[in-house]
């Protein structure tokens, strides 16, 4: 069960930074490391956590400068730095390998992790992903409304977000942490050299759909899943579908 933001207080020091983290589940299960979307903290995984714990031991963490994690005065807010931070956190927690999965903004960190630390991966998950700077967002609200309407028509409801999922300790640091995509190049083509299995998934009503399909097509070991009635931020639109895709991927790979 996910602790509230107020009660979640585990801290690990890695790369000289104090990181807020949570490690849940049975030690015998394969590790799934989840990388947050933009503007949220690790408690926002609550809608899918219980379902995912049936298959995985789950590591969550707040990237530097967000949630309850500290940051470096040198302002090292880059996806490569976030990836190195995750690798260091795994080392301190004695987690040699993980299935690293990022959603939306977090998928950029997951992609960099794969490029820099493939030896620490059992698999890679890229949900709602685009790796181009910047992302075209003009249609995001229209597409989101379409997804909500479709869900309403079939009697499904989106998750009602908790305010605490967006809590963070320092507004200026969080802003810097969540604008790294404006400064980094597209790494899509580099993913084609990966040897590990890669799961790419995106909603039909997500502005990143075409980018996600392009990324999946560029990866020899890539598998693409299309999520119907789903906008950007798929765990909040259809958490059960999101969890089933991730859990089924484990079964297919026999992780």
Describe the residue ranges of each PLM region.
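Conserved alpha/beta-hydrolase "nucleophile elbow" surrounding the catalytic nucleophile
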Residues: 38, 98, 102-107
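Conserved HGGG/HGGXW glycine-rich cap/lid loop of the alpha/beta-hydrolase fold
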Residues: 13-68
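Short beta-strand/loop motif that positions the catalytic acidic residue
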Residues: 194, 200-202
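Catalytic active-site module of serine/aspartate enzymes centered on a nucleophile-bearing elbow/loop
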Residues: 222-223, 227-255
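Hydrophobic, aromatic-rich cap/lid helix
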Residues: 161-190
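Conserved alpha/beta-hydrolase "acid-adjacent" motif
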Residues: 207-213
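Active-site loop/oxyanion-hole signature of alpha/beta-hydrolase fold enzymes
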Residues: 60-101, 244
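Flexible "cap/lid" loop of the alpha/beta hydrolase fold
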Residues: 108-116, 121-152
